[in-house]
Amino acid sequence: LDYLTANVSYNATYRWDRGATIDGTKLGNTIANQATWNADGRINFETLYNKVPIMRDVTKRFANTRPSNAPPKRARKFERTYRLSPDSSLVIKHNLRNKKVKVTAAKTDGTPVPVRFKAVDQNSVEILTRSDQNLKFTIVEILKEERSLARDIGEYALRFVLSPRVSVRYRNTRSLSLPLFQPNIGNIFGQTHSAGPMAPGLDFAFGFTDQSYVNRALERGWLITDDGQTSPAVWSRGNELNIEVNLELFKGFKVQLTFNRTDNRNSQMQFMYADMPTTYSGSYTKTHCALFTALRSPKADNGYYSKAFADFLGNIPEIRRRVEAQYAGTDYPSTGFLAGSPHAGQPFNPEVGTVGETSSDVLIPAFIAAYTNTPAHKQYLTPFPDFSAVLPNWRITYDGFINLGNMRDIFKTFTITHAYQCTYSVGSYTSYLNWAQADGNLGFTLDELTGMPVPTSPFNISSVAITERFAPLFGVNVTLKNELQLNAEYRDQRTITLNSAAGQVVEAAQKGITLGLGYKIVGFNTVLKMKGSQQGVSNDLTLNADVSFQHNQALIRRIETNYTQPTSGTNTFNINFSASYILSKRLTVAAYFDHQVNSPIVTTSSYPTSSTSYGLSFNLSLAR
């Protein structure tokens, strides 16, 4: 199993804080625990598949080795004149120790004659052509196997299968903070026997607890249940899964894929009350892909039209229909605000209260579908999808141009990069206080205007966001033979936020191009033929210059009125130059110049500005 490595660890902490006593009233102690599972594993498919001979040969072909300086091996050949027979074939013994050979024949005057042949063994061939003439035969061994397009495609595909290196990391955290705890701490594992069995218990000390622990503590009388003290029990649970896949389709072409899902949940229980009301909150993030709606530039002359936003509005009726269809056959609960209500226990009736088109249960799936270019009837409805809905981000680099032609005579390095990063996130959410559960995440809340139950999920999600970055969309980094460094890149990013509470979508976009130049003059004193340079110090002069142009724009799109309003926008031009010179082991002098011009797109929000800064800096190192 040399292709597989794995590590698993578990850590738990237990904390006990003594509570105060005020005017004879005990406020109770506070106990808390935290447990963390960490697991990571790595799989090297190349090591695994190298155990198969044919795959090992393919790996050797694509091995990242430098070309040898040894002269190329010359093919051996055999030449001799034979007379063919009209009645039988001719066997020629060439002793080249190679079954793969090329056979040609010519008359005595040099005229080529086509002949048919087959290899007998590594040292002999049989001439199948029959005639009555003298021919000069030339037999040359084939050093390199002749390749076909189909075979090349097959081997590249096999190389793609061999190349992955997969890394998986999983982290699970759980914690519980429980106030109003009466027993005092004990001597062994923090356990006391003064309140019956071990309190708070070894399961608490080692982090193996869930929400049922509070019920057990109440049954054993460990908790103060005075409703004048309302400090809640607080649970936290987090799950994070990261998968990283590294591929190398061919030499120099590297692809890194990343998958991530992070789900954090918090609960607060007021256990001192009879019905023990519980509220929930949390956050959620996953890697996403909105590539099909990316790289769009809304213009003022068409009202900042966005096809994705138009699709979002068009998705709302279909998503609302699908959400409401989940309640078919569901009965109104008989708990919470519905206890004693005439609707309690009755089948769900849309005429009493239906799913609203402006609810987060409808807007969030419609939003994700539109900006991911997914049909509304195929879009998942949950705002917290599982790992099967996680989409990859990627980074691609290629440095193989240096191996083409005479590129090495011009460049030391030549690298092309492209990266795509996108996340879907629920920044924070809370649960409805009056939510009554019907089945799973299906339930009802009270409509304050009509006094009727309306179907909804348990969570009040005010906003979700899709953040996308091409970092860069295209980038080039070059170092010439004379150490001159050149770089250029184009970046594009956007953040699209759905604010369901305000009924709007906010789009913030940023795109820009950067050109850079760098040069390092080693031993600048020597270049100027200056005296006095210190021994062991290279008086290097480093020069850097960057020119960039950046476009920023922010829009608010109203859902109810289908109206778009620009809120801000600027075009920024920047020139930056810096120089750094090493005077001695301890002293470095640097100079900089920066000029920036901002031109507003929305003139009502700002005005044109320009700024210039320049200066000198001295860096004195006092370290020995």
Region locations from a protein language model:
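Exposed, low-structure sequence patches enriched in small/polar residues
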Residues: 1-128, 134-624
